[in-house]
């Protein structure tokens, strides 16, 4: 059985496979349908349009024919899913079902199809054609016709083919649906994934679930996501969206999106609800949901995702809500518009002072002001030495009720999370004794074990042995998970991974992070995954996993230097590290450039150290003398706080710079850094080293020789194994070393592994 939506080439594939055989072809759509006599001159019965075989008597007749004629072959074609009445044959192993991906062409198949039509395209065009068509027969056949006529592949031609496909769907699919199913199919197109409940709310049709089942049985245009959850095939969804825009006026579309917004609101999916309400133009609902969403996700990085909706609100509506004013102040700060942030802070202060102190709205405003005093990135951490005790007293007096914080901003660090607490590190022992209670009280769940984790991280950054502190933290991990927040857990396990890397156990660090990632993914705590994946990428840099680093850089790196997003700063720095490892120093410098003003304005000392160290490496590789200035700036900042590991973590990449820089403010401090860098260089000698590029391809014989080199065979053993003279082996080895851009046999093995040659 071939089961696939319209356009996947079921009929053409079947006829090609059955060429030369005695075939009896019938269509279940034929009102005069009748099965051929068993003794007829046919070996294969081809039944097309099986989705229209609805009569139970005809179904039973076909089943009987299959059972009673085991010597015959039956090929069934359907646009729908496999019907239940054929399930016994599948379970018995006599029915094989081929789906859409079995019929879709791979990249090589697309290339052969075009070649058969006398069409030559570039590799880039071939890749684009395969991705755009998804290997589907209909768009490929339409494209081949145009290209064979001399037209060039372009976006304009893609649009022409899309319109031709839409005409095909109009005639062969859409026109055959009843009006009720047509309307439902169109109205569900903007909402994916969807199920019966969403279908009922959006369409207002109590029979929506039943119609969905019928629609799928007849077209298989839906892809099951999970039980009672579907999405359309992308090509068909684009067609339905096009159809919806053509057949519905603006008022009906707004009403449709409003109903979709209601469904998502009821299911507390506020991201999708806001998207729908913005399409419907309902600013009142947008305002209401932004307030509700901020209460569900206080202090988290939802501001980035929600920014377009905040920006579309009228100012008078924002000024009526302390929650929205607070959000605008934080949002402007995250966009580095500190003047705008302070303007909104002033508006919130005015809101509080213009009402009686006992007014609950004034209390809400005071609570939000206290939150901003602690959370705004432009507020210094030195000032927080007074802010925390003040907030502690107000909480005790029940004058404010603080929203929750994200003390780490979803980063694997407390010292360098929502704030950079480097200045506190100078007096970490004293502050632990005096501020631990007020800080943990003010932060509530976010304060559980915070002080212990911060203390361990502070000592770690200063180069101390934190083994016992880490053991103590790991013993408290269950308490953090029970009473605290995943933010602190991420900080603790992030610190554990860093200590493992620092002791030469990067493989253990990767396992630590992968285990945490699996748990976060299973519990749908997706807000941590981007930074967790970036940290995994850093571990892969230590391990020399070029392919994994390249994959992260290609698929997950931010790559938006024109619009700095502060919540992505850890990823920007990781991106620059990846670009250095990939040998693109100019790209690394471009990635880092927007971070410098932020580091200066918000006193981000630890990020500044990384920024200047990475820029020093890039300039050093480019033989730009400016590398000394960059390195001096990084070392000066590290020396100010006596930080060791923010520098030594860059090991082999930074060691030659430090050894030749001439920095002379403190010889003992420099010696500590140098020893730490040497130790990391021993553990990870190729850290951030640009990947080697081959100077030419290896011949078949050279590949065989390389495999034997990697198996630690001597030249004599290689000659004996391949039946060639020793002198010839030496020539091959010499050529291999040149092509791999290495000088020794041991380096050849490492290069071959990284280049996936063995």
Task: Label each residue range with its predicted role.
Residues 12, 60-128, 132, 138-146, ...:
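Alpha-helical sensor/transducer elements of the RecA-like P-loop NTPase core
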Residues 38-58:
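Conserved P-loop NTPase "ATPase switch" module shared by AAA+ and STAND
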Residues 124, 166-245, 255:
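C-terminal boundary/linker of central alpha/beta nucleotide-binding cores
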Residues 250-323, 331, 340, 344:
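Extended alpha-helical scaffolding segments used for macromolecular assembly and cargo binding
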Residues 271-272, 282-283, 321, 357-368, ...:
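Alpha-solenoid helical repeat architecture
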């Amino acid at each position: 059985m071939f089961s696939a939506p319209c356009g996947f080439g079921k009929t053409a594939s079947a006829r090609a496979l059955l060429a030369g055989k005695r075939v009896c072809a019938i269509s279940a759509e034929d009102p005069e349908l009748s099965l051929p006599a068993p003794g007829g001159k046919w070996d294969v019965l081809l039944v097309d349009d099986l989705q229209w075989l609805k009569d139970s008597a005809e179904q039973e007749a076909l089943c009987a024919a299959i059972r009673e004629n085991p010597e015959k072959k039956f090929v069934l074609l359907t646009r729908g899913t496999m019907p239940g009445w054929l399930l016994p044959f599948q379970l018995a192993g006599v029915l094989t079902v081929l789906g859409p991906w079995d019929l879709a062409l791979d990249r090589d198949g697309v290339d052969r199809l075009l070649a058969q039509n006398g069409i030559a395209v570039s590799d880039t065009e071939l890749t684009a054609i395969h991705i755009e068509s998804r290997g589907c027969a209909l768009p490929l056949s339409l494209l081949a016709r145009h290209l064979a006529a001399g037209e060039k592949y372009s976006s304009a031609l893609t649009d022409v083919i899309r319109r031709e496909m839409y005409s095909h769907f109009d005639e062969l699919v859409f026109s055959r649906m009843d009006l009720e199913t047509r309307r439902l199919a169109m109205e569900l197109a903007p909402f994916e994934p969807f199920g019966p409940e969403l279908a009922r709310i959006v369409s207002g049709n109590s029979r929506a679930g039943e119609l969905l089942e019928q629609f799928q049985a007849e077209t298989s245009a839906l892809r099951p996501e999970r039980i009672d959850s579907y999405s359309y095939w992308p090509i068909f969804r684009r067609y339905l969206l096009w159809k919806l825009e053509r057949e519905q006026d603006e008022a009906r579309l707004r009403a449709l999106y409003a109903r979709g917004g209601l469904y998502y609101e009821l299911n507390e999916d506020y991201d999708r609800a806001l998207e729908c309400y913005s399409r419907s133009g309902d600013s009142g609902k947008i305002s209401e949901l932004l307030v509700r969403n901020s209460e569900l996700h206080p202090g988290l990085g939802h501001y980035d995702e929600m920014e377009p909706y905040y920006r579309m609100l009228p100012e008078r509506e924002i000024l009526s809500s302390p929650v929205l004013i607070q959000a605008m102040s934080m949002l402007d700060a995250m966009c580095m518009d500190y003047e705008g942030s302070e303007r909104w802070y002033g508006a919130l202060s005015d809101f509080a002072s213009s009402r009686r102190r006992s007014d609950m709205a004034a209390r809400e405003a005071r609570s939000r002001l206290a939150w901003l005093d602690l959370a705004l990135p432009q507020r210094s951490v030195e000032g927080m030495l007074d802010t925390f005790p003040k907030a502690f007293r107000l909480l005790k007096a029940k004058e404010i009720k603080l929203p929750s914080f994200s003390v780490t901003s979803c980063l694997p660090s407390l010292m360098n999370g929502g704030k950079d607490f480097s200045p506190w590190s100078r007096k970490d022992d004293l502050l632990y004794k005096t501020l631990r209670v007020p800080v943990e009280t003010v932060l509530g769940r976010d304060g559980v074990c915070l002080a212990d984790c911060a203390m361990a991280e502070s000592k770690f950054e200063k180069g101390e042995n934190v083994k016992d502190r880490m053991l103590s933290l790991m013993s408290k991990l269950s308490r953090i998970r029970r009473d605290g927040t995943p933010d602190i857990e991420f900080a603790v396990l992030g610190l554990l991974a860093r200590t493992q890397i620092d002791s030469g156990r990067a493989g253990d660090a990767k396992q630590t992070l992968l285990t945490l990632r699996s748990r976060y993914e299973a519990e749908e705590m997706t807000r941590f995954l981007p930074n967790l994946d970036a940290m995994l990428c850093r571990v892969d840099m230590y391990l020399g996993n070029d392919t994994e680093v390249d994959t992260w850089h290609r698929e997950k790196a931010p790559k938006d230097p024109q619009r700095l997003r502060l919540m992505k700063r850890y990823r920007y720095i990781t991106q620059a590290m990846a670009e250095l490892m990939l040998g693109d120093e100019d790209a690394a410098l471009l990635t880092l450039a927007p971070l410098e003003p932020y580091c200066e304005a918000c006193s981000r000392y630890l990020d500044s150290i990384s920024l200047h160290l990475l820029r020093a490496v890039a300039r050093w590789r480019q033989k730009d003398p400016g590398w000394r200035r960059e390195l001096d700036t990084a070392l000066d900042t590290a020396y100010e706080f006596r930080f060791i590991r923010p520098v030594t973590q860059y090991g082999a990449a930074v060691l030659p710079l430090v050894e030749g820089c001439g920095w002379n403010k403190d010889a003992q401090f420099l010696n500590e850094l140098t020893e730490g860098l040497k130790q990391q260089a021993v553990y990870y000698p190729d850290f951030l080293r640009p990947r080697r590029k081959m100077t030419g391809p290896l011949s078949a014989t050279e590949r065989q020789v390389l495999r034997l080199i990697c198996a630690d065979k001597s030249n004599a053993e290689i000659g004996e194994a391949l039946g060639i003279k020793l002198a010839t082996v030496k020539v091959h080895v010499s050529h291999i070393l040149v092509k791999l851009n290495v000088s020794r046999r041991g380096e050849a093995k490492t290069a071959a592994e990284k280049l996936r040659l063995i």
